[in-house]
From Swiss-Prot:
Coiled-coil residues: none
Enzyme Commission number: 1.17.7.4
Cofactor needs: [4Fe-4S] cluster
Active site: 151 (proton donor)
Gene: ispH
Keyword Metal-binding in record: yes
Recorded metabolic or biological pathway in which this protein acts: Isoprenoid biosynthesis; dimethylallyl diphosphate biosynthesis; dimethylallyl diphosphate from (2E)-4-hydroxy-3-methylbutenyl diphosphate: step 1/1; Isoprenoid biosynthesis; isopentenyl diphosphate biosynthesis via DXP pathway; isopentenyl diphosphate from 1-deoxy-D-xylulose 5-phosphate: step 6/6
Family according to the record: Belongs to the IspH family.
Residues given in the record as [4Fe-4S] cluster binding sites: 37, 121, 219
Entry keyword Transit peptide: no
Binding site for dimethylallyl diphosphate: 66, 99, 149, 247-249, 292
Protein name from the UniProt record: 4-hydroxy-3-methylbut-2-enyl diphosphate reductase
Amino acid sequence: MSSAVPLNLGIAHSADSPSTRKGSAKRVLLAEPRGYCAGVDRAVETVEKALEKHGAPIYVRKEIVHNRHVVETLEDQGVIFVDETDEVPEGSLLVFSAHGVSPAVHDSAAERNLRTIDATCPLVTKVHQEAKRFARDDYDILLIGHEGHEEVEGTAGEAPDHVTIVDGPDSVDAVTVRDESKVIWLSQTTLSVDETMQTVARLRERFPNLQDPPSDDICYATQNRQVAVKAMAPECDLVIVVGSRNSSNSVRLVEVALGAGAAASYLVDYAREVDLAWLEGVQTVGITSGASVPEVLVRGVIELLAEHGYNDVQPVTTANETLVFALPRELRAARTS
């Protein structure tokens, strides 16, 4: 999915902490990889190609991806975002978001005679398949994820009688299972790797026979972005994460930056949200972006920083990503690249 490469950190390390390097020039450390993952790229292109093929309006259940700029751009092109299928006129075209939906949502769309295109990320679909498989084998499934997140709701909906949502380490004590010999954990794909492992460790203390998923559920892009932030954060007085507040993986990047040694970290949707007071006394600014963030928004932050003397931009490369997912079958002929 992603090919790891030797660390090309681009960092002139100092024995001093970031806050004590007051004689050094201002610089930007730019995390690579960052921004769009393969699943987000596929989902956004799915909506764009559906517009080209069918014309406006088309409907999307929930936000196609958790990014305000992407949603507003698509709205300008004639996309209508809805919370539930009963808001869509019968017979209309409905796209399911990258986060996936439960079988009940598919059934509801069919009852309204909606034409549907499924933009669920294939890595989310993999977790759905795991949930169904282990439910068939009558396992208790402990789904680590954020209560109320669309992805978690979709996965839990595949096997509601077998899934218990575990929202972080503090939720572990309340978990009960039917048979401690048949328990497996799965996870939301966009979590903090470190926090997820803490939750798993707590679960295993309670349920020693807890089984691991057949393959890693936290997606390659989430992990890669966290690794890049960890690599640069110790050198940063400030890390700016470009992403929306309802983006789980973007919020996690702020937490990872602070946990890895950044003196401060903030989440912004746009360059205009950067508070110039954050830059006072700051030599090194790290920049990254969540997996649903278009690169144009990152460039806006880089340009803003350049206006304030941060002209030296150094990449921090920890992995190369080459994965591309095929479009949904209904739209594959429409892909030109």
